[in-house]
């Protein structure tokens, strides 16, 4: 297959790896955080990213092999390090800055899955990316709810 193309599995792996890197980021920030509110937020986000990484791993295990091996002509960049470097946090971020970064990363995956779902040629591949899109949109809502609860404290 030409290098312009990617398999469905590569997109799922990208999501898993990005969630794993985000968990590491939140864990690292938590080690240096001083405010209890920030620590609580980072702990929540770390557990949440771990859950998302595990959810994508289960999704991959439970999916038919054929659909994961399907090729897509649409081929955006899937570089986890580039995605991580796209957003910058100060050394001691506030809870607002952390929430904004979390939502920005969610948007990265939401936009990717939405675009791939729109460009996919067959209905099964479209369905896979619509499911991934729903999973990420639910995550974004959970992060927003956690942020609201934190602000009310």
Locations of regions flagged by a protein language model:
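Non-heme di-metal
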Residues: 1-153
